[in-house]
Structures are given as structure tokens and as C-alpha cells.
Amino acid sequence: MDVDGEGDRGQNPRIMERDSDSIKDPISEPSWFTPKKLLFVFCVVNLINYIDRGAIASNGINGSRGSCTSSGTCSSGSGIQGDFNLSNFEDGVLSSAFMVGLLVASPIFASLAKSVNPFRLIGVGLSIWTLAVIGCGLSFDFWSITICRMFVGVGEASFVSLAAPFIDDNAPHDQKSAWLAVFYMCIPTGYAFGYVYGGVVGSVLPWRAAFWGEAILMLPFAVLGFVIKPLHLKGFAPDDTGKPRTDNLNVLPVGYGFSAVMKDLKLLLVDKVYVTNILGYIAYNFVLGAYSYWGPKAGYNIYKMENADMIFGGVTVVCGIVGTLSGGVILDYMDATISNAFKVLSVSTFIGAIFCFAAFCFKSMYAFLALFAVGELLVFATQGPVNFIVLHCVKPSLRPLAMAMSTVSIHIFGDVPSSPLVGVLQDYVNNWRVTSLVLTFVLFPAAAIWSIGIFLNSVDRYNEDSEPDAVTRESTAAPLLQEA
């Protein structure tokens, strides 16, 4: 019977049922790797990834160009911008270079998740990430560090499309938004720690040392990706062939993979709820991306903040933690539905935009910090709800690709163009206050787009049947995480 059924196990319901029973075999001992430990590991990896983003934007690592006064007195530059003599535009391009690798690799990793142990994919990606940041520390000009930043994006791609679905699957039913919020809380927290980390390292060591430190932090998690037992995502059934499980990265034929990805992409593009959510997210990320990169420099120039990295880092970490967690908890309290998620997104972004815009109108640094902190608190409340919509408006088997394309979209149309465009605007107007006000105004269209989603006919597809051919072929092991 095993031989006869081996060729069509992805489509035979009896075999699928038998496979489901085998997963629950009591012989398989529960793993020490509990859902909370899984969340912890993903959070730390996410934190390190965004520490890197914050560090490269910090004044300590990014630095400034050399300058000369009208009297002929010249001062040498500092950091990356000073060593490589980068213009503001080139500096903005450097912040966005990771997106090239992320754009190319995200759909590939998402499609491979149907046939390859996803933790092996994460292990490969984090290994590439580690080598890439080492390369950043060894770079010698603009193009060498830019290419290394592109490979940082390749490494990140393996992680962004798979982490959130795993968390969503293993979180308690009434705490899904809160668990997602904890994970996405690591984005502003990582940026903030990155500002502080960059400022501290840049003040005592060469800027290159910051990248080598990041590589040391990430290396254990890259190794973990290769040695941990496999997890199975909802919507991807293990194909038990009776053969020993292999961890080799065997993939489906190229033609099949490409056609499957294109078919899935079409399903995403015609989903009004998904598209509306992503359009709002793009406008939102356009602002947040430029804030994160240019914020310390703008604060230093507008308000003469002597410790801009530390101040922005402190405000961002507190507001990021409180705001992100609050958004997830509020959505769970309201009843986590797609319509309610859109309500949280539109209201918090609109009110937050008012406070952030008003902050830049004040000349007092203390008034600015107070208003901007409230604005950031509200704006960061979006992280849990926006990703809840991405995960629940599509079928389970589409979630990795939905997350991948969400990440690609918000970067390629959001923070990738925003950093260099803000640099161009600043080069033109030479006034950081005006530049910051123009940038902040973009939050209002984001709130308006998300408000449209409240009135769409939204259906939570989390419990819809998965596609019969969505099979993780290389694993016969029981699920790593089991409900208590």
C-alpha cells in the first residue's frame, strides 16, 4: 500500500487522514521548544536585524561628510559617509540597498516553503545575513558596501515570510494579535537599540566594528536554523513517505515553482482587502522608513540635540514597545476581526499624524519631544493589526507569500524611495523642518486608505481548507510545537 500510494499522497484524502493520525503518534515526545520559546527566538532575530538598520542610520556609524567654511577651514568627515565621501542621495541609497536582495529572494523563499523544511531556509538566510554584515565591515567604497547591504536583504528574506505565520499558528486563540505585536515590537525597539549601539560603538571603536558585532550576535541563530527539528505551518501538510526524513534543500522543478508563484500572486492582487491593507501600509512605511533613517540627523540639525542618537533611540524604544503592544492588546480586546483591525489602523494613524506634524511646528525641543512621543506611540499601534490582516485575509497556504509580498511592497514602494527622496528634498530646500513636515503629511493618506478597509466585505480565511498540493515533502517528523 505504501508503494502504490506514494506518487499521489498530496491529493489522496485517506492518506492525508492517515498522515494526520501519524503526526499525533504518542511515540513522538513533546519537544522542549515550546511556542513561547519559538516566539522568543523569532523576536531576538528580528531585534538583531533591526539593530543593524538602526546602527547604519546612527550618527555614530553613518557619520557625516567633510566640510569647508568660506574662510577655507576644513573639517574631516566621520563614519561611513565621511570615509566614502557620500552625498545625501548616495547615503539614502545605501539605506535602501538591502531591498534589492529582499525583492528577489522573498518570493523564492516563500515558494520553497512548500517543499523545504522552513527552518533550513531560515538557517541558510541567516548565514547569508551574517556573512553580509561581515562584508559591510570590510567594505572599501560605496559600491562594495552597497553590494553587501543587498545580500543583507537576501538573508532577511528567508525570515520575514515565515516567522509571522509560525507565530500566528502557535499563539493562543485570544492572544494572536498580542503575540504578533510582541514580534513586531522588535522593529522600533531594534531601530532604537541600533541608534544607541551605533552611537556607543562609533564613539569608542571604528564604525566597522559595529557590523562585526552584529555578525557575532546572529551566528548562533543561523546555526539553530540547521539543527532544530522541523515545524509545520497550517496549510502545509507533511508528506509521510515512510522514508527517513532528509534535511537537504531539495526543491520542486523550476517551471512548477514559477507557475505556482504567479498563480498565487494573482490571487493576492485581486483580493481587495489585501490590496487596501498593503496600500495603506506602503504610505505608512514611506514615512516611518525616512523617520528611522533621517530622524537623528534631522533632530540634530533642527533642535541642536547633542545626543540625537540617544534621544531618538530612547523615545523610539519606549513608544515602540508601549504603542505596538497596545495596538495588539486593543485589537484582541475589541475582538480580533479584519474590520476592527482596519478601525485601529485608521484611527491611530490619523491621530498620531496630527501629533507628529504639530511636533515639528514647535521651536522648543521639549515641546517637540513631548508631542512627537505621543505621535509615535499612536503610530506604532499599527504593527499588530496590519499584519493580522495580512495573515487572516488569505488562505493558510498563501500566508508565506502574502507576508513576503507585503514586506517587498512596503519597502520597494515605501521606505526604499523615501530615504533618497527625502535626501533629495533636503538637498533642494536645505531646511530640515520643512522636509520633516512634508514627510509627516504622508501619514494622512495612509489613514484615509486604511479607513476604506472598514467598509469592505472582509472574511477571515484562517480556517479555510488548504490547497491539497501544498505539501512539505521532506519531513516525516511530528510537529515541533504541540498545544497543551
Curated annotation (Swiss-Prot):
Modified positions (Phosphoserine) in chain numbering: S466
Annotated transmembrane regions: 38-58, 93-113, 122-142, 147-167, 181-201, 209-229, 273-293, 311-331, 345-362, 377-397, 405-425, 436-456
Domain of life: Eukaryota
Pfam families: MFS_1
Disulfide bonds: none
GO biological process, any: lipid transport
Topology term for the membrane: Multi-pass membrane protein
SUPFAM superfamilies hit by this protein: MFS general substrate transporter
PROSITE patterns, sorted: MFS (PS50850)
CDD domains named in the record: MFS_spinster_like
Glycosylation positions in this chain: N62, N85
One GO cellular component, as annotated: lysosomal membrane
Gene Ontology terms for molecular function: transmembrane transporter activity
UniProt-annotated location(s): Late endosome membrane; Lysosome membrane
Region (Disordered): 1-23
Keywords from the named record: Endosome, Glycoprotein, Lipid transport, Lysosome, Membrane, Phosphoprotein, Transmembrane, Transmembrane helix, Transport
PANTHER family, alphabetized: SPHINGOLIPID TRANSPORTER SPINSTER HOMOLOG 2-RELATED, SPINSTER
Family indicated by similarity: Belongs to the major facilitator superfamily. Spinster (TC 2.A.1.49) family.
Functional note: Probable sphingolipid transporter that plays a central role in endosomes and/or lysosomes storage.
Protein name (database record): Probable sphingolipid transporter spinster homolog 2
Species of the source: Arabidopsis thaliana
